[in-house]
């Protein structure tokens, strides 16, 4: 459905979806700022990859990733209880691999997945990008993907990918204007 159709919803400009994306981004930033040891090359911080989708299913371009699951019994809806979402995200960031899938209504799917490469992956990858970030960049180009968000377990960088572009904030710059240090 295109934007010029009367019943089309432009999710990328929808207020509730913007709140959803902001909430997820803030939780990732908080995970980054609360973790310690980022300067230690032997330390592995929390890592996360979440995708916000508008379609009914990601089955045509994603596969379940083993037994990795989002703890839906603790947090099923991002916006219904952001505190519960943050607590679940903390656990997932350290214990699970794969991509969490969130519908535009804020519901988190239980299965963690691995997105397959799009038919024509592309774009320029930045030097700092690992496989999680390259996948997020490519995945963000899919029609049903509103945004992909990552937290780098190597550096604490938080990145929002949309339509093959990205806005990335290094850990040191997260909330820098509000920090007293």
Kindly label every feature range from the protein language model:
Residues 2-181:
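Divalent-cation
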């Amino acid at each position: 459905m295109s934007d010029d159709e009367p019943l089309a919803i432009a999710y990328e400009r929808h207020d509730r979806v913007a709140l959803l994306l902001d909430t997820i981004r803030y939780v990732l930033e908080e995970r980054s700022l609360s973790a310690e040891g980022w300067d230690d090359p032997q330390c592995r911080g929390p890592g996360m990859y979440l995708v916000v989708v508008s379609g009914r299913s990601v089955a045509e371009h994603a596969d379940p990733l083993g037994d990795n699951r989002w703890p839906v019994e603790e947090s099923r809806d991002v916006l219904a209880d952001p505190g519960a979402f943050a607590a679940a995200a903390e656990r997932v960031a350290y214990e699970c691999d794969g991509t969490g899938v969130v519908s535009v209504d804020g519901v988190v799917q239980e299965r963690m997945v691995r997105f397959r490469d799009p038919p024509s992956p592309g774009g320029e990858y930045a030097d700092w990008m690992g496989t999680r970030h390259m996948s997020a960049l490519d995945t963000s180009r899919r029609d049903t993907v509103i945004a992909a968000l990552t937290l780098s377990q190597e550096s604490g960088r938080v990145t929002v990918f949309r339509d093959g572009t990205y806005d990335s904030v290094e850990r040191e710059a997260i909330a820098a204007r509000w920090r007293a240090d």
